[in-house]
Amino acid sequence: YNSGKLEESFVRGNLERECIEEKCSFEEAREVFENTEKTNEFWKQYVDGDQCEPNPCLNGGLCKDDINSYECWCQVGFEGKNCELDATCNIKNGRCKQFCKTGADSKVLCSCTTGYRLAPDQKSCKPAVPFPCGRVSVSHSPTTLTRAEIIFSNMDYENSTEVEPILDSLTESNQSSDDFIRIVGGENAKPGQFPWQVLLNGKIDAFCGGSIINEKWVVTAAHCIEPGVKITVVAGEYNTEETEPTEQRRNVIRAIPHHSYNATVNKYSHDIALLELDEPLTLNSYVTPICIADKEYTNIFLKFGSGYVSGWGRVFNRGRSATILQYLKVPLVDRATCLRSTKVTIYSNMFCAGFHEGGKDSCLGDSGGPHVTEVEGTSFLTGIISWGEECAVKGKYGIYTKVSRYVNW
């Protein structure tokens, strides 16, 4: 005879008598099974039904029933109570606050830019130096910049090719040698609000802007450089009509335009250059470098849709230059709209930002200045103010150098 089948029949008969015809207790069920593990499995469904029917676990997860609850065993790459969270970097950046990579075991590995370290939660980034890049350390009352901060929890960057509705623009003529860019329709910045911004003085005072990338180097637009013209960099500048204690002046000892830049062929293609300073800057709350991510993340940050531009350029088309540092939030413009807005060639190393309705833009004198995207309280360089057709004109946009194309350089 088959003792297994006989035992199963005996248990089934006792179970029906003890727990189905009448309500039984756990102890009574235990007497039937004579095994705690089997009793537990039975009891989970007997008390409140099978919580795994239908299966609440998503993305191929396996369901384990429990009393008044259940547990999902998730497939690799998913997590959460119902395996609903993509544990890779594609969704909400893997919950990393700066950079995310997927390791060999398919687990998310968060990391931080230079000057930051991972917090104990292994997601956030904490400053590791007194004046880390991209952070505003001067205390201000709440500003537009702070309120507009982008957080990864609102962003699935796998869908980041979509951009926000058209907002404001930055411009400079591709034809005229004196059509440098300025901020039109912007706001007065607060002292120390854009501590990476520098002013370039040459044979014309305040002719361009730039961004601090470390104590010895500044990045600007290549078309701002003229052979034989001495350039002075002013960091910590705020009001150009006053000499302020926050200012630091350095001479440029070497200007390095990108090796593909050729002004005789096209003045604004590959419009990026590095400036080496004669003495290191002293970093403080008013003189702080901008963060630069790798190529992938610089492109991701740009596609978030909105960035900030700043400078001392003209405050209206063909008007006077600003004396107080100006800033403006500008939306990224999709490439098709950008190409339709002009007869001038827009190369793949450029992008458009600004407002279709006009009235706000960068303008003459802003060239070389930063286009930054603030992410989780840290600002990253995503563009360089390059050119445009006039300033703040309806249907025209500001054209910027796409920094992601030059990070490795």
Curated annotation (Swiss-Prot):
Residues annotated for Ca(2+) 4 binding in this entry: 16, 21
Residues holding Mg(2+) 2: 27, 31
Binding-site residues for Ca(2+) 6, renumbered to this chain: 37, 41
Domain Peptidase S1: 183-409
InterPro entries xref list: Coagulation_fac-like_Gla_dom (IPR017857), EGF-like_Ca-bd_dom (IPR001881), EGF-like_dom (IPR000742), EGF-type_Asp/Asn_hydroxyl_site (IPR000152), EGF_Ca-bd_CS (IPR018097), GLA-like_dom_SF (IPR035972), GLA_domain (IPR000294), Pept_S1A_FX (IPR012224)
Family designation: Belongs to the peptidase S1 family.
Name of this chain's protein: Coagulation factor IX
